[in-house]
Amino acid sequence: MACRSWVLGILLVLVGCAGPEVHQGEVTTVVIQPVQEQADIANEPFVLTGRLAVNARQHRFSGGIRWQHTGQSDEIYLFSPLGQIVAEIFRDQTGVRLVTSEPAIYRAQNAEYLTSQVLGWELPLAGMRFWVRGTHFPDTVAEKDLDKNRRTVAIRQDGWQVVYQNYYPAQEGMSVLPRLLEFSRPDVKMRLLVDQWQGETKSGDATGRKLP
């Protein structure tokens, strides 16, 4: 019963998060061309914890997520509603490794292929490490919708649409970070609710933000 209530809680929160939606008022659309230089944001570390709901054609997932990112690596843990690890995804310069709860270990050169083959839905890690921070992947063309405060409302890139439904309130010395996002393409829809961000402030000090 507790498990069912936990899952229902995830779905209710991910369907409608309290707080104002960001896509209100006038929106400006810009097209951004690829750049050869790697964006500095790619090297900025972060840790996020939250809840993820995935609805693919034949596969679904609802549970927790913990994602630790550095410029050289990613570690992503997916959890069941009861807190058990469902999958561990590791990326470094040698490729990507996915460990399931059996346990079984799978390897590939990119997370997109590996997750689609093992989990049944694609985790677009190359773009997602930028999208979760409200910006575009610099290697390919992106179409970006901005509100009057130049905050990202939506990104369309590499066949994906990312919609930013809620942000953390702005705080002095910190960048504005997304709170509730939706990633979609015709065969899959994902909703991510970030419960807590940890990273670096503009002054270089460690910081964390948590939902009220």
Swiss-Prot record:
**Gene3D superfamilies, A to Z:** Lipoprotein localisation LolA/LolB/LppX
The UniProt record lists lipidation (N-palmitoyl cysteine) at: C17
One cellular component (GO) term of this entry? cell outer membrane
Membrane topology for this entry?
A: Lipid-anchor
> Where is it localised?
Cell outer membrane
Q: Which InterPro entries match?
A: LolA/LolB/LppX, OM_lipoprot_LolB
Which SUPFAM superfamilies does the annotation name? Prokaryotic lipoproteins and lipoprotein localization factors
List membrane-spanning regions.
Answer: none
Its BP terms in the Gene Ontology are: lipoprotein localization to outer membrane; protein transport
Q: Which domain of life is it from?
A: Bacteria
- Main localization is membrane
Where a lipid (S-diacylglycerol cysteine) is covalently attached, the residues are C17
CDD domains referenced in this protein's UniProt entry, alphabetically: LolB
Q: Tell me any Pfam family this protein matches.
A: LolB
**Entry keyword set:** Cell outer membrane, Chaperone, Lipoprotein, Membrane, Palmitate, Protein transport, Signal, Transport
Q: Where is the signal peptide?
A: 1-16
Assembly and interaction partners: Monomer.
Tell me the function of this protein: Plays a critical role in the incorporation of lipoproteins in the outer membrane after they are released by the LolA protein.
What HAMAP family does the entry give?
LolB (MF_00233)
Q: What does the similarity note say?
A: Belongs to the LolB family.
What name does this protein carry? Outer-membrane lipoprotein LolB
Q: Which organism is it from?
A: Nitrosomonas europaea (strain ATCC 19718 / CIP 103999 / KCTC 2705 / NBRC 14298)
- What lineage is on file? Bacteria, Pseudomonadati, Pseudomonadota, Betaproteobacteria, Nitrosomonadales
